[in-house]
């Protein structure tokens, strides 16, 4: 798993997953609404809602917004119906791309994603085309500028983490989905500040790209994530850190 697309690290280095704070809060609200609708409004008995709330808090989303989203999901407040969809496609160089979308209009979302793939040198594919390349994993992000990365890596593995990846002052800790919350709590108990913790679709294998193709793929992934209806984007590209730095210096 080490050597995957490092997409969480790339987003961290960029400064934020979304260019607009308001757009980020909208996406977080949708996740909370959907989770509350699917599993009920109590975080104690709804792991997905618990994770969505923690992610919103990590992003400094106001507590009033969080409570309102929970009430919309439970039906206590009126709100639009949110549906979840997984869209699959290929980017430049045949890179596999998985898009997690949430919206109140599937046709609009599919149309927007298809347009962005086409514009970015890729194509939207049929269901099942690339999803088999990915598996769901917990990914815990930690800033490591003031930490002993070797010691932290050993701690994480001892706690049950499956793998770690360190790159330019940032560490990603990979866990089985059911273990993520437990490992996060153990790290926090030992004084480690968690930057993010979420379920990501991680590729089982990755592909190396030349610089030109990598730049095209990075742009496509960015543009897809900027769409209002897109929650997360995963790919099986393995980016050279120097190329990523060059891309962001030009973006």
From Swiss-Prot:
Q: Its Gene Ontology molecular function terms?
A: DNA binding
BP GO terms, sorted: regulation of DNA-templated transcription
Q: List membrane-spanning regions.
A: none
List the subcellular locations. Cytoplasm
| Organism of derivation | Dehalococcoides mccartyi (strain ATCC BAA-2100 / JCM 16839 / KCTC 5957 / BAV1)
Q: Which InterPro entries match?
A: Integrase-like_N, TACO1_YebC-like_2nd/3rd_dom, TACO1_YebC_N, Transcrip_reg_TACO1-like, Transcrip_reg_TACO1-like_dom3, YebC-like
Instruction: One GO cellular component term, please give it.
Output: cytosol
Xref: Gene3D superfamilies: 1.10.10.200, 3.30.70.980
In Swiss-Prot or TrEMBL terms, this protein is called: Probable transcriptional regulatory protein DehaBAV1_0421
Record keywords: Cytoplasm, DNA-binding, Transcription, Transcription regulation
**From which domain of life does this come?**
Bacteria
The primary location reported for this protein is cytoplasm
Q: Which family does it belong to?
A: Belongs to the TACO1 family.
